[in-house]
Amino acid sequence: MANAAAQRRQLVPFAALSATYFAHIGFFNPYLPLWLKELGLPIVVISLLTSVQSFTRVFAPYAWGALSDHTGERVRLLRLSAAIALVASLGLWWDGGAWWIGLVLLVLFTHTSSMMSLTEAAMAHLVAGDWGRYGRVRLWGSAGFMLTVFAAGAWFEGHGMRDFPAWTAVTLGGVLLCTWWLPDVREKHAHERAVKEPIAPVLREPAVRWFFASLFFHVMAHFAIYGFLSLYLDALGYSKAMIGTLWAVSVLVEIAWFFAQGRLIGRLRMTQWLVVGGAAAVLRMALTAGLGGWLAAMFIAQALHALTFASHHTACIAMLTQHFPGRLRGRGQALFTVIGYGLGGVLGVL
């Protein structure tokens, strides 16, 4: 009992890190294009600069994951990546043109794109298959995301985009502080065990291959929604306020799912949850494409986010925990990011 209570206390810093990291993402990703536009950059250059994040997701997470498996220093690597990202963000204050911004974003995204995979790997032993506990950690990320989406939107509406670099530095500063709050755990003798646990045999397992294939297509479909839903709804005549409301619906149901998943997730096997998430995604895309002009259908489509993202994400983490234990954990989490949010994300927005 005392050990369980201690583990719950150790998860509090991970919840704080999830909140601050997604608070950073919640303002940075939506408003980066608007800041670049205010700088006077052409749309083609803006498109190239915003694609840097997807590019880094193809290589950076696996490099960081392999290094964390080799050293066992997942928390220290999180602190290092957060510190470098914060220092890199200071370059956004200097007006060096598009090439300079591209370089700054490359360094910044190289060190932030792997943070969640490293975090998931670091806290895996604390969750220990308790997916209700995992959900209560993860919901803080969703809450942080929604908070800064609206707070930053209101701020930029009233003050313009000139404070974008300051928001970047403040939120990354919060991320760095939370990494220093994490329990400083290290997996002992990492180097000796890492060389004995190659990842290739795991990747040859049919279940693992099918898992990553389904992940790729599932995330690719969702990135089409993430990238173009606002433009699509705007073309259908929805107001800006209603577009924001529909986005908020998806985040609210995500938070609700993570809060309640301890009572729900055990009703099906994790592989069955993957099937449910895939079927819900098909329905969500069909409603969005076929009935986009009907507001009720769009509310239903956005509410399906609880299944197409939240439950699917938990099932994915459970599958990774099962197939990539111990010294394989960092690389497994990294492959999840690379295949899903790197390759799948890039192709999803093309």
PLM feature spans:
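Juxtamembrane intracellular "pre-TM" segments in multi-pass secondary transporters
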Residues: M1-R8, L182-L215, A235
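Helix-loop boundary and gating motifs at the non-cytosolic
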Residues: A4-S54, V208-L246, H313
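Loop-to-transmembrane helix entry/capping segments in MFS-fold secondary transporters
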Residues: I43-V44, A128-W140, K240-A241, F324-T337
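Helix-to-loop junctions at the C-terminal end of transmembrane segments
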Residues: F59-E73, F156-E157, A256-M270
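Structural signature of the two symmetry-related core transmembrane helices
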Residues: R76-L90, Q272-L287
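Symmetry-related core transmembrane helices of the 12-TM Major Facilitator Superfamily/SLC fold
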Residues: D163-W180
